[in-house]
Amino acid sequence: MMQKLKAAVAGICCLFGSSASGNSILEIQTGLRALHQVQDEIARGVPDASQLQNAVLGRLTEIFESSPNSFLSGQEAQSALAELALSGGDRTRMANLIRLSQGSGELEPLLSIVQFYLEADMTKAALAIEEAEGMEDGASGIEHYLALAKGTAWLESDLPKAREAFEQALLDAPGTLVEEVALRRLAVIGLQQKDADLFVRCAILYSRRYAKSPFAPEFWSGFADGIQMVSNSKDI
């Protein structure tokens, strides 16, 4: 665990040692890797990791905001921007940057999903997902984040699709903050659908990996209802 955090700190040091006007996609990608390492430690309950996360999110946002539109509209930059936006970047600032980056390119449909997700317009996000169907090849490296966004967009309108998306996130990103979020949301779906097997599977995996997560209280808040649902549906 400490090795991962040390590696993240090394990446963060490189990020803060760079010029904000350098517009280096390599710097941004290094920063994103460091961010994800820190977030995975947050999910496991490592103290002080949240402060590192906030610093990296702020720095990466500054780099994007100091970049010209010509840089933002490049496919690598668009992909990295979508990744940052879905990784917890400030929603208002991220949505503005995504609007500036749009114009043309393979990632335009996927950027629309991210923009509506950031704006919390899940109806439009769901429509954008339908329009982007079959275009996932352009989202290499951010599939698990898009799976979370898709699942969230479908939560109120299509629980089976939402469940499928969150299950995909579990497969794509085991042992990460993405998995932690997906498990919490799948547990809620298990309760709503009275699916005891799904709830138990999520509860076992969550308790093994994320019991110390700062987000764990949200999971445990529905635990009693889940146990009651399981006891009503199984002989235990």
Spans of features found by a protein language model:
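Sec-dependent signal peptide recognition
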Residues: 3-11
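N-terminal signal peptide c-region/cleavage motif recognized by signal peptidases
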Residues: 15-19
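N-terminal leader/linker segments that initiate helical-solenoid repeat arrays
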Residues: 21-107, 111
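Generic helix N-cap/helix-start motif at coil->alpha-helix transitions
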Residues: 23, 36-39, 68-78, 102-112, ...
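Helix-turn-helix repeat elements of alpha-solenoid scaffolds
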Residues: 47-58, 81-93, 116-130, 154-164, ...
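Solenoid-like repeat scaffolds
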Residues: 63-69, 96-105, 131-140, 167-176, ...
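Conserved small-residue packing positions in alpha-helical repeats and bundles
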Residues: 82, 112-116, 150-151, 187, ...
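Glycine- and small hydrophobic-enriched segments that form the cores of compact globular domains
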Residues: 116-192
